[in-house]
From Swiss-Prot:
One of its GO terms (molecular function) is phosphoribosylglycinamide formyltransferase activity. Its EC number is 2.1.2.2. It comes from Dictyostelium discoideum (Social amoeba). The lineage of its organism: Eukaryota, Amoebozoa, Evosea, Eumycetozoa, Dictyostelia. N(1)-(5-phospho-beta-D-ribosyl)glycinamide binds at G13, T14, N15, E192. This is Phosphoribosylglycinamide formyltransferase.
Length: 206
């Protein structure tokens, strides 16, 4: 039985490409049913199209413009969940560079209603360290102040608290004296691709 996933992206789609490559090489026995982006210009959509994967664009900005006063993010979350529910056989939702914090309305659709669907995210920090944005830069600054010698990445299940859900996989990444922020970010990205693919493999074969 094929394990079906939905991938949410916001940008270049390098993590998406890593998943596509792992499927094409037969390392992953999964099917990407749909790639959804909140940005029409996201290059990851082109990567999906080249691999003959269905794509959808669902922008938050439209909701903010229509009703900037009320809680439009909650409405956006509900509507996004409805789109994913159109694909009745989804087994896993993967956030691969998705830059919008998902509201509780979205998360509860997949935790409170059947069938439940796990949602996983990649965060460039170890559990309990550097939640939120700019995690690599914050780790690099702490390294320069001799506060840490390494950082890392984790793949975790998504809950309402940012970057705090059940951990699926972690990978420690040393910070070298010769590192620049750019070289450290590159090493992080290389490991992110591997770890995201490995996490999908773990969940699809359990």
């Amino acid at each position: 039985m094929t394990f079906n996933i939905c991938v949410l992206i916001s940008g270049n789609g390098t993590n998406l490409q890593a998943i596509i490559d792992a499927i094409e090489s037969k390392y992953l026995n999964v099917c990407i049913k749909v790639v959804i982006s909140n940005k029409e210009t996201a290059y990851g959509l082109e990567r999906a199209k080249k691999a003959s994967i269905e794509t959808r664009v669902f922008s938050l900005q439209k909701y903010l413009k229509q009703d900037p006063i009320n809680n439009t993010r909650s409405t956006y979350g509900l509507e996004l969940a409805k789109i994913i529910r159109e694909y009745s056989s989804i087994d896993l939702i993967v956030l691969a560079g998705w830059m919008i914090i998902l509201p509780a309305t979205f998360l509860k659709e997949f935790t409170d209603n059947k069938p439940t669907i796990d949602i996983i995210n990649l965060h460039p920090a170890l559990p309990g360290q550097y939640p939120g944005a700019h995690a690599i830069e914050r780790a690099f600054n702490d390294f320069k102040e001799n506060k840490i010698k390494h950082s890392g990445i984790m793949i975790h299940k998504v809950i309402e608290e940012v970057d705090a859900g059940e951990v699926i996989l972690t990978k420690e990444i040393p910070i070298l004296p010769t590192d620049t922020l750019e070289s450290l970010e590159e090493r992080f990205h290389q490991q992110e691709h591997k770890s995201l693919v490995e996490s999908i493999k773990l969940l699809s074969t359990k």
